[in-house]
Each structure stands twice: as structure tokens, then as C-alpha cells.
Curated annotation (Swiss-Prot):
UniProt keyword Oxidoreductase, yes or no: no
Segments carrying motif 'HIGH' region: 47-56
One Gene Ontology biological process: tyrosyl-tRNA aminoacylation
Organism: Acidithiobacillus ferrooxidans
SMART domains with a match to the protein in the record: S4 (SM00363)
Subunit relationships: Homodimer.
Domain S4 RNA-binding: 342-403
Name of the protein in question: Tyrosine--tRNA ligase
Amino acid sequence: MTMKHQDAFEQIAFGTVDMLPEGEMLARLAAAQRDNRPLRIKLGMDPTAPDLHLGAYVLLHKARQFQDLGHRLLFVIGDFTAMIGDPTGKSVTRKALSREEVVANAATYRPQVFKILDPERTEVMFNSEWLGALRPEELIQIAACYTVARMLERDDFNKRYSANQPIAIHEFLYPLLQGYDSVAIKADVELGGTDQRFNLLVGRELQREYGQKPQLVLTMPILEGLDGVQKMSKSLGNFIAVEDPPAEMFGKIMSISDFLMWRYYALLSRVPAVEQTRLQKEAASGARNPRDIKLDLAGELVRRFHGTAAAQEAHIAFLARFQRHETPEDLPLQAIKLSEAPRLSQLLVQVHLAASTSEAMRKMKEGAVRVDWRRVVDPATILALDAVYLLQFGKRHFARVALQKGE
């Protein structure tokens, strides 16, 4: 193997959890270079929501690294599988989306993913093209490739089965159809989160059954949300959306802990691994303030999604707030257990931002209250449980709270 192959391998390997089978990725990269045949890299996403958050961009960032090495990305929009619903990590059967919901969500994906991906090295596909055309006998043939016992090896299925909770037959079809996507597009490598490991390996098995060379599987970590504990999720409220306004995105990134900052660098930044190691040493020795390193990260990510001018404006605005002591940086996270979703006005009193609910409601009407950087003026606003919020009361008073279900 040449040094060039080794460098490419190290770039791809950085930040990954699994590269399966072990030891094959380097050889596959070298063979692609030798034969002048770009690898076909598969990345699939079900359009279950209209917008993406940075958790999805961990995979897109890794896909772009493959593209920069000359390989071709097959971006599969799971418009068919979204109507089944991915059971991964679910304790109950997931509600399937309608065709209309899927189409509406999918329409927003292209402009968002091409903020990262190279359009010249990307093929966008919809898996309804081949899954929707399957005849009943072909579906039976796919189902015959896997046993119920193998399906129950999945942790989520096994837990539900052991707890006597129902598992619908169509949920068993999901990993099979995701795996068949790899057969249909002849994937060489498939990318996915660690929670998708089982499904990705099903793709290898099906390719073998259909006489194809099995794909390699590369898994990436699940990105933690702003709380640094749970995975980034819209339902938990701890997310940074790709479409967040520049100042809001910048501020959210600056609100993460210094520890979590290195995680975001490793999974989202284009700063080389060697440079990241140097930055960590400088921060640990006191040679550089971690805040300044975090400013660089916030600037890089905002620039990627919104452009240089917007990133510069967001940077200047943040520093202006900081100099006036208006920044929420390094605020402690207050965990609050509640039996029901609270009114924002009551929560402001509970965290000692407002002296009374009447004061809180008055400030809301005046436009002096923000939640996650968004102004909230409706005094009747209720916040959902199992979510993390940044509260701002007036210009200088902030609180970070994690609302949890409890007594």
C-alpha cells in the first residue's frame, strides 16, 4: 500500500466507530485507486421531517470526505421505507407517514444536503423507484433471506418480544428493504449511525444472497445534543437545525460545554485530526482559551451553512453580547422534574428569572423573553417535557433548563 492510500484510509477512519469487516477498507480504497473505479458510497435517509439537524450532518460530513477522495455518493431518500417507519430504538410500533407527508418532507432535503455534499459526485435516488416496483413473489424472495430468529437478535426487537409487546410484521420488513436498497444500487460501502449497524449488516447479507460483493459497513457515533447527554433530537429540543438563523446557530454552538466542543470538532469540523489534537493540547496547557477555539468552531459551521458574511456578522454580534455580559456561555444546566408540561411564565419564576408570573407575562408581551433565541410573546406558551431550553429574560438574564417527566 502506498502512503497515499494510507492517508486516505486514516482520513476515512477518523471519528468512525465500526469499519466492517475489519481490515478491508484500506484494501478496497487501494483497489479503487488501482482500477480507476470510484467506490459507490451509499447513504440513506428517510424523510420523516422537513428539516435536518446537525446530527444528520455527521454522516453527510463523512460522505463528503469520500467524495473529496474521488468516490461517488449514492444518496438514497427513503420515500418508500419512510411509509413503513424505522423501528430502530423504538419500544412501540412507529406511526407510518402518509405518501403526502413523505413527499413534502423529501422536497426540502436537496437544498439542505447540498450545503455539504458535492453535487457533481452525488446521485440522488428515491427507493420507491425499485421497492415500489417489487412483485409479491420478489418480496417473498427477499423475506426468505432472513429468519425471525435473526430479526430477534436486534436489541429493540428482542426487548419488545421479551416484554410481550407487539411487533408488527411490516417492522421486520424495514431492515430487509433497507438492505435491498444496497442490492438495487450495487453499493460498495454503506454509511450509518451506530444505531443502524444491524440494518447495514443485513444489506451485506442480501448482497451476498443476490450474488454481489458485500458492501463494507462504516458506522459513525450518534451526536449528542446541546445538553451533552442525550442524542441530538428535535423531540428532545436539544438540537441545532441546519436552517437555524446564523446568529441562533452561532449562539447555540457557543452554549455547549468545552468537553462537548471536542466531540463536535471530531464529528462536524473539517479541521484535520492533527490540528484538532494540537488545539486540545493548547487548551489543556492554557496556551489558548477554549472559548476562542469554540468561536472558531461556531464560525466554521455557520460559514458552511450560511456563508462567510453571515458567519462574520454572527461572530461580531456574539462578541458584542459577551462584552456586555449578555452571553449564555457556560451556564449550568438545571434539571427540573415536573408532572406536566409547564407554562413558560411559571417556569421563569421557578428558575428565578422573574419575580412573579404577572411580571413574566408582562415581559413576554413586551418581547423581552426568548426561548432558544426565539422571541416568545404569547403568555399562554407551554413548553414540552423531555427537552432542553435556553431561557432569556430581558437582555442579561439567562438560564439553561432540562425539563424531565417526574413527580
